[in-house]
Amino acid sequence: SLTEELKHINTLDWIEQKSNRNFKSKDTYLLSHEQFKNIKNFIYESLNKFTKNILVSDQRLVVTQCWLNKNPKGSKHHEHVHPNSIISGVFYFKQDPKLPPISFSKSIQHAMKLDPKKYNNLNSETFLLPCTDGELILFPSNLKHSVPVNMGDEPRISMSFNTFSIDTLGSEDSLTHLDIRRIMNEHN
C-alpha cells in the first residue's frame, strides 16, 4: 500500500507548468526523502534487473533526478525526451483506470513505410500503456513520450526519474569511450 507515500505527496510544494496546465514537484531529488525509501528500493532493484537482463550490461545506473507530476482534469504533458539520461522511468500512484495512459512514439521515422494491415505495438508509430497502481515503466530516455489530456476528475500522479551510469561508458576500440573520472582528473 502506498498510503504513507500519498500522505507525504500532499505535503510537497508544486510548480505549475503553464503550457500544459500540469504541476511538478518543486523538489527534484525526491528519492532522498525517507517517506519514499520503499519506492527507491523498488526502483533500484528494477533498474538493476533491467540493466542485467534486458540491456545485458554490467553498467551501474543511478538515479540523477526524481520528481512528481500531477495532471489535474484538463491538463496534459507535451511530447518530450529526457536529455542527459540513459534510462528514464515513471512510477504510478493511485491510478484510476480511466486516467490517460502514457504514450510512446518512435523517435526515428522511417524513410519508407509499408502499410500494415493491422497495427500492433511492434509496427505502430505510437503505442499507449495504461497507468496501473504501483507500476514502474522503464524506457530509453531518448524515446519520445507524452500524456494525453486528463478528462477524469481525479489527478493523475506519477513519479518520474532519470538515470546515468557511474561506470565508464563505451570502449576505446569503438571510439565511444567516456570516462568522466579520467576527464575530470586531466582537467584539474
Q: Residue locations for each model-derived region?
A:
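A generic structural micro-feature
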Residues: 58-60, 81-85, 151-155
